[in-house]
Amino acid sequence: MGNLVAIVGRPNVGKSTLFNRLTKTRQAIVNDEAGTTRDRQYGKSEWLGREFSVVDTGGWVVNSDDIFEEEIRKQVLMAVDEADVILFVVDVTNGVTDLDMQVAAILRRAKSPVIMVANKTDNHELRYNAPEFYRLGLGDPYCISAISGSGTGDLMDLIVSKFKKESDEILDEDIPRFAVVGRPNAGKSSIVNAFIGEERNIVTEIAGTTRDSIYTRYNKFGFDFYLVDTAGIRKKNKVNEDLEYYSVVRSIRAIEGADVCILMVDATRGIESQDLNIFSLIQKNSKGLVVVVNKWDLVENKTDKVMKTFEEAIRSRFAPFVDFPIVFASALTKQRILKVLEEARKVYENRMIKIPTARLNEEMLPLIEAYPPPATKGKYIKIKYVTQLPNTQVPSFVFFANLPQYVKEPYRRFLENKMREKWDLSGTPINIYIRQK
């Protein structure tokens, strides 16, 4: 199960730069203007063999009397509840501010480890400013320069050392793990209740810490499966919380623990930006996907044409990955609820597919010979052999070629599309590798 690292602090202390450094991306916009990170940023990282998710809590709150304090207050409170490690970023060039003190007052009550990151120590002299931050009561300030990378390797060592040891609990690997995810009010709780009913038919429950995912094993409708949920759900009245950010953090937890994600879409609202954000999380984590268009009972004029138009719109927004099942359902009336579980089970089986090497070559090589990769720089590319890699999270295939460096992304997509035509790989991502023969 992955860990969650939250980056918190007042605006313009370098949170987005640190996020980019930890995730090795340029995903977060970096600007000197405070409040530049208007959207929530989340990414994946790995260090010393430990994978973890990173959330940059920068952002912007609309129609707030005090934009910065309101945003920081809500996101720090959520970080305190959700994160395994909290990075509190301060700016040594500005010293301790009132906002720093307000954030520190909250973090001193955190149950998770807090690392105070003294950023912008771009030269040795600036390190002499760091001791000022001891008065925040959060231990030693850890000096780094996010923009140059100085000190970030040691910071990563420290972050990983704070993670709890991985649970010794072992799940039955032959039983699929389903997570129901989606934006607020899409019907997640309703469909879970429809799945498991009032009796809940619990076989066994495996839980870790209060922030870990819970795997509850059910047997329902003839299916044996784990339903992935997260512990320690906070009551809505505990804080006037930012629901979008909170659901993203919660989705990270559920997605990481699942084999197949059941993404709930509200039929009365269609695809919105947060649906795309959660879909992106599913893709980043290489999980199986079933899209459920919930509240279908509320749609008027439910003709086949309307259903087809809705389906085409979903696939268009999720492109280029379009090979996944879509179920039009109603958690309230339990319409097609069994089909949701059936499709999730199929996607799980597709993720587990093992295709014999002889069959792969028998089906794919004639296609490749008929439609070879385009010649590059006058050189002809020949693919001689294909095999499936063992023990991978998703189906992964290696095509051996004489000039693998010249096989471009469009041809990889061609190979993937042809494989999806030949075998049922619906709902699961696949990996295509081109290697030297």
UniProtKB/Swiss-Prot annotation:
Pfam (any one): KH_dom-like
Keywords from the named record: GTP-binding, Nucleotide-binding, Repeat, Ribosome biogenesis
UniProt binding sites for GTP 1: 9-16, 56-60, 119-122
InterPro entries named in the record: G_ENGA (IPR031166), GTP-bd (IPR006073), GTPase_Der (IPR016484), KH_dom-like (IPR032859), KH_dom-like_a/b (IPR015946), P-loop_NTPase (IPR027417), Small_GTP-bd (IPR005225)
Family: Belongs to the TRAFAC class TrmE-Era-EngA-EngB-Septin-like GTPase superfamily. EngA (Der) GTPase family.
The KH-like domain, residue ranges: 353-437
Gene source species: Bacteroides fragilis (strain ATCC 25285 / DSM 2151 / CCUG 4856 / JCM 11019 / LMG 10263 / NCTC 9343 / Onslow / VPI 2553 / EN-2)
HAMAP family, A to Z: GTPase_Der (MF_00195)
Keyword check for Glycoprotein: no
Protein task: GTPase that plays an essential role in the late steps of ribosome biogenesis.
Highest taxon in the source lineage: Bacteria
GO biological process per UniProt: ribosome biogenesis
Subunit structure: Associates with the 50S ribosomal subunit.
Chain positions recorded as GTP 2 binding sites: 182-189, 229-233, 294-297
Any one Gene Ontology molecular-function term assigned to this protein's record: GTP binding
NCBIfam families in alphabetical order: GTPase_EngA, small_GTP
Domain EngA-type G: 3-167, 176-352
Gene3D superfamilies registered for this protein in UniProt: 3.30.300.20, P-loop containing nucleotide triphosphate hydrolases
Name the UniProt record assigns to this protein: GTPase Der
